[in-house]
Design a protein with these regions (language model features):
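Extreme N-terminal leader/anchor segments
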Residues: 1-56
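Aromatic-lined, polymer-binding surfaces characteristic
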Residues: 79-304, 311-312
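CBM-like, beta-strand-rich accessory domains located in the C-terminal region of large
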Residues: 151, 309-311, 340, 344-348, ...
Length: 656
């Protein structure tokens, strides 16, 4: 790539003048953290640790770890490849920027300047031309010049550091030429390597790499070649939107965490395009809007994302809706989140995403709006046809009942889990029956355990997994599965799924919310041979589940649920795990319902689950009609009859 001969005496003041005209980064960061002393102290502690060469990375078990002064950029010190790539993303620089904004202490920008100079010196870019079989390995895997890390650096830590150092006059004459040369190295690599790695533009890595390329062009837009960088990036980002965002809005991998990560990147592209005067096509902007809708529907009423697949129950929704407001000026997503998440919690969550939320004041949003139920004109269900996912809830409030239900077989890639027709259920402000999260990407026993069907809210036959776990990101023997239907009627919402993982046996599952207060899980297994037991698994977010004398399972927490299963199922409890962040797990209780019957043909199983706080509802025995297509039960003075005929569901409620 031909590079412009630079007149440093001219270029530096041009660039600095432009960046100083932007909103001052330190002022904005101080505004976000003004009344958040705990968050400020947490960030200051992290930044001071970084000045001592200690950072928290994958494999350090959530504790500061000495990575060197300067860091050993190439070295995997904990036998975890993510350690190297995260170190080379320099996310601790962001904490140092905030720490300076709060304290004015020069030690923080001095660390950024010294580490940037050391990285440029210690990590020369490998050649991007030549035999592809020799070039490719240098930009894949846990290496400083992994193409993914190159893209992430440009749009995140390096862009933030660039703006900060320029605005606060810490970009030194010695560092600036090194910085420009390294950005040019990044741009050349991002133009040439990723298109060969991802020719279909269908992976989140390619999205990261092209947003990074666009940001390289923004940082050095005074250089003639920057327009070429941004033109290629824009062209490829439009392909990314087409190939990575489905028509219904979900990101193709179907993991809410990665979805929000991708929306963060699309949003940052849109913001950079605004600053650079580049217009994004209207159809691409509409796809991004649809994607923000998905993020909202995949939000638990507890204020956390559903940890489906390789996801955590995180708070990225704050970043997503904040970026949505910054890009589109639309408040509907912010209004919905403000109804679900209390203001003080929302402000605390936003401190984790300061750089994405410049100019977003949740304080003013909450004070300016009256969040009455009848004013929020958002549907209560969302069917992602291409992802084979359905999300529905009883309302946009923290006590609503909500279901995330999916049946995507085969999985799109290794970020999926072995959970066909699985679901995640919340009620009364608590996640009750949950997806276990992700824990790690390392090749170890816990990775397989977390991905197992038996750790999800699923059904197994003969104790066998629906398909085979090969390694951390690979499965085998996947068959087919899909969502069949989403239906809504008076007092109910129901969705149906089917998969052939145990062929010739066919598993159908219907999940419904009835009467705004009950979760119904109806499993139907056809072509049973009578040779193997059927197990239904529920991963319960509790340690107090116990079997009552009438056969009901009940919990004894602040927020509880009771479960009554149809007759003929043996109930026992197994230890479970829930992971809410990388490298951390806590115990849960798995409820196992087992049918050891030997009859052949069709079998039906029904679970009635009711959330409650203090007084456990009395659920009667659950009975099927002889044909297995009609089931009935009562709760208190209400009698319920459910019919599931030929893939159609009908529900009747009567009061005694």
């Amino acid at each position: 790539m031909k590079r412009t001969v630079v007149d440093w005496n001219s270029l530096f003041p041009q660039v600095q003048s432009r960046v100083k005209r932007q909103e001052n980064l330190c002022d904005s960061l101080r505004a976000i953290l003004a009344d958040q002393p705990e968050a400020a102290e947490r960030i200051l502690t992290t930044a001071r640790n970084a000045c001592e060469g200690k950072v928290i990375l994958s494999g350090t078990m959530g504790k500061p770890f000495f990575v060197g002064k300067p860091p050993h950029w190439h070295e995997d010190m904990v036998n975890d490849g993510e350690f190297v790539v995260e170190l080379n993303r320099m996310q601790h620089w962001n904490d140092c920027i905030i720490a300076y904004a709060l304290t004015g202490e020069r030690v923080f920008p001095e660390l950024i300047v010294s580490e940037m100079a050391d990285w440029i010196k210690s990590c020369p870019r490998p050649a991007v031309e030549g035999d592809w079989d020799e070039v490719r390995p240098n930009f894949r895997g846990p290496k400083p010049w992994s193409s993914l890390e190159g893209g992430l650096r440009m749009m995140n830590a390096w862009y933030n550091a660039f703006c900060f150092l320029m605005q606060e006059d810490f970009m030194t004459p010695a560092l600036f030429p090194l910085f420009v040369g390294s950005v040019e190295d990044h741009a050349e690599m991002l133009m040439k390597v990723p298109p060969k790695l991802w020719p279909e533009a269908n992976h989140n890595h390619y999205l990261s790499e092209n947003v990074g390329l666009f940001y390289a062009g923004e940082m050095l837009q005074e250089l003639p070649e920057a327009k070429e960088w941004q033109a290629q990036a824009e062209r490829e980002l439009e392909r990314c939107a087409k190939n990575q965002l489905t028509l219904d809005g979900g990101q193709v991998e179907g993991c809410p965490l990665y979805h929000n990560v991708c929306i963060d990147m699309f949003g940052k592209w849109a913001l950079s395009a605004k600053r650079c005067g580049v217009e994004i096509p209207s159809d691409v902007l509409q796809q991004i809007r649809n994607a923000i809708d998905y993020a909202l529907y995949s939000l638990r009423p507890t204020g956390e994302g559903v940890p489906w697949g390789d996801s955590d129950p995180d708070d990225q929704i704050v970043q997503t809706v904040g970026l949505g407001y910054r890009v589109f000026g639309s408040r509907e997503w912010v209004d919905a989140v403000c109804r679900i998440i209390p203001l003080e919690k929302l402000k605390k969550m936003s401190t984790r995403y300061c750089f994405s939320l410049i100019g977003v004041s949740f304080d003013s949003f909450a004070k300016a709006a009256d969040f009455r139920t009848d004013e929020l004109q958002l549907p209560l269900s969302n069917w992602q046809h291409q992802l084979q996912q359905v999300m529905f809830r009883t309302g946009w409030d923290k006590d609503a009942l909500s279901v995330f239900f999916a049946c995507r077989v085969p999985c799109q890639n290794g970020h999926g889990h072995i959970d066909p027709a699985g679901f995640d259920f919340c009620g009364l402000g608590k996640a009750l029956l949950v997806d276990p999260g992700r824990y790690t990407y390392r090749e170890e026993e816990m990775r397989q355990t977390i991905k197992s069907a038996k750790m999800h809210n699923t059904l197994t036959i003969g104790g066998r997994e629906p398909f085979t776990y090969i390694s951390s990101f690979h499965f085998a023997n996947e068959k087919d599965g899909c969502i069949l239907d989403l239906s809504e009627g008076e007092n109910y919402t129901a969705a149906q799924a089917l998969h052939t993982s145990y062929f010739p046996m066919i598993h159908q599952r219907l999940v419904a919310i009835l009467d705004r207060s009950i979760l119904l899980v109806w499993d139907r297994v056809d072509h049973m041979t009578g040779e193997e037991p059927v197990e239904i698994w529920y991963n319960a977010n509790t340690l107090t589940a116990a079997l009552q004398s009438d056969g009901t399972v009940a919990t004894h927490d602040d927020v509880n649920f009771c479960l009554r299963a149809s007759e003929g199922l043996r109930i026992d409890f197994q230890p479970g795990v829930i992971s809410e962040q990388v490298d951390a797990v806590r115990p849960s209780t798995r409820i196992r319902l087992t049918d050891n019957a030997s009859e052949k043909g069709v079998r039906n199983y029904l679970s009635v689950i009711v959330p409650y706080q203090e007084n456990c509802p009395k659920i009667s025995a659950v009975r099927f009609e002889e044909d297995g297509k009609t089931a009935s039960f009562s709760i208190g003075q209400k009698k319920y009859q459910c019919n599931w005929w030929d893939d159609r569901f009908h529900f009747d409620l009567s009061c005694c």
